[in-house]
Amino acid sequence: MAAAEPASSGQQAPAGQGQGQRPPPQPPQAQAPQPPPPPQLGGAGGGSSRHEKSLGLLTTKFVSLLQEAKDGVLDLKAAADTLAVRQKRRIYDITNVLEGIDLIEKKSKNSIQWKGVGAGCNTKEVIDRLRYLKAEIEDLELKERELDQQKLWLQQSIKNVMDDSINNRFSYVTHEDICNCFNGDTLLAIQAPSGTQLEVPIPEMGQNGQKKYQINLKSHSGPIHVLLINKESSSSKPVVFPVPPPDDLTQPSSQSLTPVTPQKSSMATQNLPEQHVSERSQALQQTSATDISSAGSISGDIIDELMSSDVFPLLRLSPTPADDYNFNLDDNEGVCDLFDVQILNY
C-alpha cells in the first residue's frame, strides 16, 4: 500500500518528528465575559440617563441660556433645539413656573424676556447704582442716630435745668433776648392757657397795596394776654405795652402828648430781669390803667404814629364792667366775629 501524504496545512512539523505524524490537539481556551457597553449620553443613537432627563437640571440649563441671551430675550424653539428637548411641553412647564414667580414675561407666543435685564440696560451700572444707594442709606442712618443722640442730650439738659431749684429763678426770657432773635420785626408776645387755638388766615391785599393780617385766638379755659414788643434799633430799649391798650390811649385827646424821656424806656417790669415772664405780664396788666406819664411805657412818637393812622391798630375788645356778653361763637368763628371790628392794616 502506498503511504498517505500529509495534509498541507501550512504548519511545519517540529524538528525531531517525522513527517508522517500530526501534532496533538490543543484544548479549547475559555474566553472572559465582556462588560456591557456604557450608555450613550444625549446621543441620537442612545437613550438619555435619568439625571439628564430631570426637570431641575433642565431648568438650570434653561435659565443659563436665558441669562446669556441678548437683552434677556430667548426664543423657545431655539432653546428646545439647544437643550435637545423632544417634548416641548417640558419647556413650557419651566416658563409657566418662571412667569408665575414674576421672573420672566412673554414677548410673543414663542419668545420670553428675563425681567432682570431690559433693553439697553447695563447690569454693571445697575449693580454700581445699587451699591451707591446702599452706602447712602447707611450714611443717612448714621446721621439719624447722631441726631437722635443729640436730641436725647438736649432733653436731658433741659430736664436737669428745670429740675434744679437754683436754676428755676433764671427760667425766663427778657425782652431784649426776644428782640435780638427777631430783629426788625414787630413782635406779639402771647400768654395763653394750654389748649388755646391759634389761627392765622391767609392775608388779603388791601386797597393801598398792603396785606391785611389777622390772628385769631380762642381759649375755653382762661384769659389770653397779648403784649406788643417793639424795638427800633439795636441801641434802643424794647417798648412793651399790652394789647388792647389802656382806655386813655384809645380815646383821642385834644392835648398833645409829650414824651416822658428822650429815649424809649421800657415798663417798670423791665427793672426785674430775674422774674418769670408770667409775673412780668401780670405786672403789665396791673399797670396798664395808670397814667402815661407815671408809667413811662410809651413815648410820644409812637402814640402820635398810632393815632395818626386811619384805623387805630390796637382796639380794646373787653366790655366795660357794666356790660356783659350776650353772644356766642360757633366752632368755625373767631374773636373778630364776636365784635364789629374792621380788618387791621399793618
UniProtKB/Swiss-Prot annotation:
One of its GO terms (biological process) is cell projection organization. Residues 119-215 are annotated as: Dimerization. Keywords: Activator, Cilium biogenesis/degradation, DNA-binding, Nucleus, Transcription, Transcription regulation. Residues 1-52, 236-295 are annotated as: Disordered. Residues 323-340 are annotated as: RBL2 association. One of its GO terms (cellular component) is nucleolus. The keyword Transcription regulation applies. A motif (DEF box) lies at residues 81-118. Residues 47-118 bind DNA. Transcriptional activator that binds to E2F sites, these sites are present in the promoter of many genes whose products are involved in cell proliferation. May mediate growth factor-initiated signal transduction. It is likely involved in the early responses of resting cells to growth factor stimulation. Specifically required for multiciliate cell differentiation: together with MCIDAS and E2F5, binds and activate genes required for centriole biogenesis. This is Transcription factor E2F5. It comes from Homo sapiens (Human).
